[in-house]
Amino acid sequence: MVKGTPGIVNLEGPVSERLPNRDHLLLWNAPAALAELSGLNVRIAGIANNHSLDAGAVGAEQTIEALRNHGILPAGGTAGAAVLEFNGLVIAVTAHDLTQGVPVNLEADLAAARQHSAVLIATFHITGPASFLPRPKLRHAVEIAYHAGANVIVAHGTHALGPVERRPHAVIAWGLGNVAFACDCTQEEDAMILRVVVGSDKVVSAEALPLRAGLNNRPARPSPEAAAIFDLLEAIGSSPLQRKGTSAFF
């Protein structure tokens, strides 16, 4: 991340201690991880995903409180939209889980978030086998977000990359992969960071930065195969890329 620039992540699972009597806890984040995220200037964490209730409803509420105590705004679930003011712009960030389908209240949620913000960032969590191509329900949700005025639309959850796309008032990243993930459920190492510069109701620039995901306690690194990642993105239907070494603008 650029120093001083706020970061947005999906936090997969609750913040919780692993206790002997909580065998049902499938995926969780150690409380100490929040200080690390805060140190990286992560300002917003989406908490709407298929593991958000792994510590139960109480665990989900405790996660919201823990994030706020570390200066990180939660987005999604009972927290609703996160609203951040940065460089004079009011930025709203929403997070929705599509595991059970497109939420019936999605359009209303996005309209409410857009009403009082200069920039709307809509994020979606989608589950299923790793695939470079977006699933129908993700396409449906993205179209709703675009027509609701979202300027940046991002999907995550299948552990796989997806195309990047530029439209008149928005950019779309159809799949980011993972930055860091300690789970035997995936071995997908290709990932990317989306870096955007925004103005009021517009995206000034959008840049894809390929990563090698930090899986199972290995650190995330810039991808040594950035050119191959760009080839892949173009092959699966991305908007034209302007390559600049290890990053590409679109």
Where are these regions (language model features)?
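Acidic, metal/ion-coordinating pockets
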Residues: 1-250
